């Protein structure tokens, strides 16, 4: 899946990650989007790295990977910030 697809997934994944893990994070909506994009890209890369198959296209599996990646990045961001 191209980087543009991961950015779009990241936008949505960031919003969902924030919804799943509510809390006060600096940066507001912009930070949520940025963490979602980073999480989606990292999630896709890790999924491929660990042999879960190539994540490509707009499908449910890719979306789940993007959301999980965004949640992990949000968790790490909060741990570093606190």
From Swiss-Prot:
Statement: the UniProt record of this protein carries the keyword Transmembrane helix: yes
Protein family according to the UniProt entry: Belongs to the UPF0410 family.
Primary residence: membrane
Species the sequence originates in: Escherichia coli (strain K12)
Transmembrane feature ranges: 26-46, 57-77
Pfam families given in the database record: Transgly_assoc
Protein's name in the database: UPF0410 protein YeaQ
InterPro entries: Transgly_assoc
Membrane topology: Multi-pass membrane protein
Keywords, alphabetical: Cell inner membrane, Cell membrane, Membrane, Transmembrane, Transmembrane helix
Compartments where found: Cell inner membrane
Domain of life: Bacteria
GO cellular component, one term: plasma membrane
């Amino acid at each position: 899946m191209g980087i543009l697809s991961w950015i779009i997934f990241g936008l949505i994944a960031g919003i969902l990650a924030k919804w799943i893990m509510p809390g006060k994070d600096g940066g507001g909506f912009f930070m949520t989007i940025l963490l979602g994009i980073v999480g989606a890209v990292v999630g896709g890369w890790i999924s491929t790295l660990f042999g879960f198959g190539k994540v490509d296209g707009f499908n449910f599996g890719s979306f789940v990977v993007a959301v999980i990646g965004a949640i992990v990045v949000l968790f790490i961001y909060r741990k570093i910030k606190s």
